[in-house]
């Protein structure tokens, strides 16, 4: 979910909204939770960290986005990892309900994450599960499937068939367990579809097909999704959610999305309010600044008043998006730079070549001992940790924690590691700032990328509901 790669394509705009001038554009009434607390869960989490559906703190969420499905070269809806999605048997110790899958049972047709998601929903009936299509590597064929009325209709129909009706591919000769898949096997798993097209109309460097016609075709694609989801929902007796993930900053100024029309079509918009900065920049800065520090070096081509979480919200509201359609994104990961001099404790300084892992997760920082998660001051119902050192969020093992009051963003700096190591990240304090913004501006809620990146205690997820 990178937005920085599109920076060269940004076009400056002349509209910069102030908080006092925010319009509340009328939007289509939407269903689903009015106070969204969402997180993404990926089908590769089982490999990357051994993080399973059973570990998701569903009691702290009301929406779970599953990443990713994707459009295929054939113009249909596809799964990006069928083994993880619906084939991999789950043992009793890893199952949500403690019951193992039976790969020898010819009557069991659903395994993997999909089966565990059904069990998660049974245990937490308020949680809606939404399949996200696309992402950075899965957006290649969006331009093609959105190009004509016929291609849009066929693609959306295949998504309804695969994801909502649950008609999964099956072939005992090539799929194991041989009973996996088939008609209706995944019925009831998903309560909606999320579109993460990165990005219509431009070449962000991810190999995605693109055309100037994408900008309007993306709107038409969402409208076709809305039409078919509503039609199928009427027959099924429920409302299926439709959401879209849209970029931060002024990337939309001359369009990669028609904001007001999209707002009226979807239930809500997930704002990609992160990756404002990273190792692609010539200097260190914050991955997800809450607001703009005036000392932040300008990004070429960017309207800097939009280059923060609060600035992005202002921009969307000024361009016709209703507040109740905006869900603010929170990254559960940071950005790391090395070869950073000690001036200003590493902030806004030049850096060396990117490290092998330039996006450490909050789990990496806390559970491996670089940052302390004992935070006690975010409010009367604060996140409180007693198992760590008790030093209220300070850096550990050579790192010191600093805080930029203008950007409302923390960072870690170690002057001796790798010639000076700077890590921008989000902690529960920063999540609480975003929760207050949501309440202040009457926005729809918060969402996180992604749940397995949280620390073992789930501190960031808990902070999504901070006072």
Task: Describe these PLM feature segments.
Residues 43-47, 68-73, 135-140, 197-204, ...:
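Solvent-exposed loop/turn segments at secondary-structure junctions
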Residues 72-101, 277-298, 330-437:
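Glycan-binding loop/region signatures in secreted carbohydrate-active enzymes
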Residues 64, 131, 195, 225, ...:
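Conserved, mostly hydrophobic/aromatic
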Residues 1-24:
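Secretory targeting and sorting signals
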Residues 48-51, 243-283, 334-351:
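Substrate-binding cleft/loops of secretory-pathway carbohydrate-active enzymes
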Residues 31-177, 213, 307, 357, ...:
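Glycan-recognition patch characteristic of GH18 chitinases/ENGases
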Residues 140-262, 280:
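Active-site cleft segment of glycoside hydrolase catalytic domains centered on the general acid/base Glu
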Residues 60-62, 66-73, 81, 186, ...:
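Aromatic- and acid-rich polysaccharide-binding/catalytic face
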């Amino acid at each position: 979910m990178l937005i920085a790669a599109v920076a060269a394509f940004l076009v400056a705009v002349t509209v910069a909204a102030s908080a006092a001038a925010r319009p509340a554009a009328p939007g289509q009434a939407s269903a689903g939770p009015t106070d969204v607390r969402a997180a993404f869960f990926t089908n590769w989490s089982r490999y990357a960290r051994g993080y399973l559906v059973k570990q998701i703190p569903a009691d702290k969420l009301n929406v779970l986005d599953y990443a990713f499905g994707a459009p295929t070269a054939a113009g249909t809806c596809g799964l990006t990892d069928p083994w993880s999605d619906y084939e991999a048997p789950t043992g009793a110790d890893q199952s949500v309900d403690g019951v193992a899958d039976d790969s020898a049972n010819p009557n069991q047709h659903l395994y993997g994450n999909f089966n565990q998601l059904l069990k998660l929903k049974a245990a937490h009936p308020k949680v809606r599960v939404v399949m996200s299509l696309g992402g950075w590597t899965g957006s290649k064929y969006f331009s093609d499937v959105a190009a004509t009325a016929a291609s849009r209709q066929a693609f959306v129909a295949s998504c309804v068939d695969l994801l909502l009706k649950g008609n999964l591919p099956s072939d005992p000769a090539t799929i194991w367990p041989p009973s996996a898949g088939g008609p209706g096997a995944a019925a009831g798993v998903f309560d909606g579809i999320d579109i993460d097209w990165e990005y219509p109309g431009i070449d962000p460097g991810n190999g995605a097909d693109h055309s100037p016609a994408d900008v309007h075709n993306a709107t038409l694609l969402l409208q076709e999704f809305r039409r078919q989801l509503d039609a199928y929902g009427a027959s099924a007796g429920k409302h299926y959610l439709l959401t879209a993930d849209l970029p931060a900053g002024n990337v939309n100024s001359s369009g990669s999305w028609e904001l007001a029309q999209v707002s009226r079509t979807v239930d809500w918009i997930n704002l990609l309010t992160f990756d404002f900065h990273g190792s692609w920049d010539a200097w260190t800065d914050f991955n997800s600044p809450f607001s703009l520090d005036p000392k932040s070096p300008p990004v070429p081509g960017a309207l800097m008043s939009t280059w923060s979480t609060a600035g992005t919200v202002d921009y969307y509201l000024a361009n016709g998006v209703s507040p109740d359609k905006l869900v603010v994104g929170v990254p559960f990961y940071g950005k790391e730079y090395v070869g950073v001099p000690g001036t200003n404790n590493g902030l806004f300084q030049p850096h060396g070549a990117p490290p092998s892992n330039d996006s450490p997760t909050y789990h990496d920082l806390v559970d491996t001992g670089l940052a302390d998660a004992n935070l006690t001051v975010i409010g009367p119902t604060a996140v409180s940790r007693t198992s760590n050192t008790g030093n209220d969020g300070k850096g550990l093992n050579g790192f010191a924690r600093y805080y930029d009051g203008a950007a409302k963003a923390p960072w870690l700096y170690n002057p001796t590691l790798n010639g000076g190591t700077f890590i921008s990240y989000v902690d529960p304090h920063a999540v609480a700032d975003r929760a207050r913004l949501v309440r202040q501006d009457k926005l729809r809620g918060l969402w996180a990328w992604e749940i397995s990146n949280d620390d073992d205690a789930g501190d960031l997820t808990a902070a999504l509901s901070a006072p």
